[in-house]
Amino acid sequence: MLDREKGGYFGFEVSPDYQISQSYVPHTNILSTNFVSEENEFAVVDFMPCYHLSDASNCYRPAEIYRYIRRIKGTPRFKINYEPAPDYARGKTIFNTTSEYIETYSTSNSKDRQYLYSSLPLHNILEQKEIVLAKDEFLLLSYNEKVIPVNIEREKLEYCRTLVYWLNWTDRTKKFTVYNDIIERSLLVLKLMSFYNGAVLAAITTSLPETIGEVRNWDYRFCWLRDASMSIETLFQIGHVEAARRFMRFVQSTFVSQHDTYQIMYGIRGERKLTEVILGHLSGYKNSRPVRIGNDAYHQLQNDSFGYLMDLIYQYYRLMPGTLDEVEDMWEMVKSILTNVMIDWKKPDKGIWEIRGEGQHFVSSKVMCWVALDRGARIADLLNKPTYRRRWSEEATVIKENVMKNGWKEEMQSFSQTYGNSDLDASLLLMEPYGFIDPRDIRYHKTVQAIKNALLYKGLMYRYKSHDDFGLPSSAFTICTFWLIRALYVIGEKEEARSLFEEMLHNSNHLGLFSEDIDFETKEQLGNFPQAYSHLALVNTAILFSEEDIRLSFK
């Protein structure tokens, strides 16, 4: 994807007379690609093993993917194109073939090794010879050399166990009277982006451009506190308590109590140093340079981040208080976070959109600092800590007064992006869902209408239309359209909101997935894919127009 010449691939080549389609096995993250011609038919079923062991608290999730080739009709013919390019194609790929597997690694990093197992002759795969499918076959690509026999019986066992895992997982999800399939698919996406330790990725790709040919290409394979908190809160509200519990443990294990050690994002294993590197030897997706790995945003001050986290902490511990030691650990973390917020809310920051220029006083950042202190005061109230409750509540009041004074612009009849400009920003729509402003407040109504008039174009939303470090944004930001739909709904424009939501659903890909951005004209998916932001917002918006189907909650 990131270089058509140097990039790796692992695919099937068939004659032009085949029709190709894809779908998920219902209620799972198992993907089936179907190849159909007049005389022949076969399917490639892709899945990553995932299932509970005899100890239900542990899950088997190796770093590997099975490709089960199922013969359906006739004698299908195809070639397998297997050309891995490990370590971002920075070195030459070395192939080592044994009687069991094809091992590959890069001369630039020999520790990163892949092992391809198959029931098909390995030399036919390496030489890209035509294969005649007479029976079911399989491929297994693993990052580990297997220590038990790999055969088709093992593959079928892994498939069945994985199928049961996903069916059980979706069975624990709340069911809705309308849009249930759409909600379920988005939740399955969020689940796939959750690591076993509780961390949640913003997306699973790097450097897919926000606009073709431009430089807004970022590595999203990290855990932002903001994105992860929003994702986990969505999963939590839909019935997946364990996801929230794991994330809380991740946050508590990653954080320490010194103010100067907090970051707005971490590596998936809690890594703190996420140095950004440009891979100049790669041409980029559709020649959109640069290709980046790492993300220097980890240095940034983004004052809004702790608002989302504190909202989740409050919701979680209000409903799932946990053990005494867990609550005490949480309380120490809350005090440390809010010490941070009390100091930093007055400072300019980089904001939710992570500008790389000079920091500004973003209204949405101030609002989320209010959220952090408001939720902290509520937690203090739950724990009978009146001194902290009073201190944080008073500071939250100061922030709200500050925003109302400096963020509301009479000449615009709207809140503005920053204290120092008169631009509009879709993140202002978050003032209502987080409780900063009442949906009946005329200032919110006017802000929603102003944002819609300025930023909505062809059924899609800009984040903002002001110049930033890279010029003017030129693509739609998917989550912002969902934010607008909610805002219209809560101010009473429910029919308009529903119509816009239905239109938005047509912009997903053939599997119901959304990326970060969408091209206004062509509706092409742009940016990193799939995007947690987009799918959590889709779920939160869809349930506005539905209700829980309690008939399906009985077991």
Residue spans of the language-model regions?
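Acidic, mature catalytic/reactive cores of soluble proteins
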Residues: 1-555
